[in-house]
Amino acid sequence: MTNHRLVQLIVCLSLIPAAPMGAGTFGDHFEDATLRLDFYQYGDAETEHMALDRLVKQGRWAGPIAHLIDPHPYGRYIVRVSEVDGGDVLFERGFDSYFGEYRMTGPAETGVSRVYHETLLLPFPRHEVQIDLSARAVEGAETLLVGFTVDPTGIEIAREQPTPGVTVIDGHIAGDPHECLDISFVGEGYTEDEIETFEADVKRFTKLMLSREPYASSKDSINIRGVVLPSPDSGVDEPTKGTWRATALGASFNSFGSPRYLLTEANRLLRDIAANAPYDTIVIMVNHDRYGGGGLYNRYCTFTAHGPFAGYLLLHEFGHSF
């Protein structure tokens, strides 16, 4: 299945009324809120491990309230939320990770271990649940990497407010988050004096995206918002040029040694900023004119907003990430 067809499928599924799942409906098992699961993933090409960092209760659940079991759970990894003691599976999604990319690099193949921070967004449970994160082999076999129970009343679940000082603008709002695909354009490398540029970029790329298929025919089921925390410096790091910038997300060219690969390892900062608006997926819009970007499935994508191929980069990298 192509990425475009996958987008169409997810948008269509989100419009179908809630149907029975397991032993009940969405409201029987989940609140209309988000459980943010932060974890660390570490190892090398031959070994990998996961460890829980923290749990956070955030705002409204942006995902669908029906079809919580992904019919096509692509990706190197999978997360499952189940009733305790081997009960029904209540939620399931496939995903990729930054560490999954690292495992294919030269340093990882020579045994150099690295640790990276990751996040999953889940519907917030009404009762105690079991959460399992597993690696998936090409043939479909799974290896459990970490599993734990979550008590929604537990004091270990943080409930602080999202990062302050963040600007949120509407690019295109079609409806309720449960019934729409919610895309957040998170700005990177925009200073306080460049917020108007960020707002113009959000509107420009919203218009472009919704003019192309499959998004054009599904625009009544897509919400797009812009989210930005001003950066001290404009632009992003370019290590091979000796250019270093203090920015909100710490994004950098030359990720994993590839000149055009543009990613961020500051996942917690990214998620703290993005939490100011409901989202299913993140597009990091970088204030730069150099050709570059990247995309991780069900994580995020990046693209540079001011080069001659910016529109192509957005559509291409979004296809990798969602």
Residue ranges and their predicted role:
Residues 1-9:
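Bacterial N-terminal signal peptides that target proteins for export
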Residues 23-118:
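N-terminal prosegments of processed precursors
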Residues 235-237, 267-301:
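Catalytic zinc-binding patch centered on the HExxH motif and its immediate surroundings
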Residues 154-216, 226-238, 243, 252-255, ...:
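Fold-level signature of zinc-dependent metallopeptidase catalytic domains
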Residues 195-198, 294-315:
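Short pre-active-site segment immediately N-terminal to the catalytic Zn-binding motif
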Residues 109-177:
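Extended acidic/polar, glycine-enriched regions
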Residues 318-322:
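Catalytic Zn2+-binding segment of zinc metalloproteases
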Residues 8-18:
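Bacterial N-terminal signal peptides
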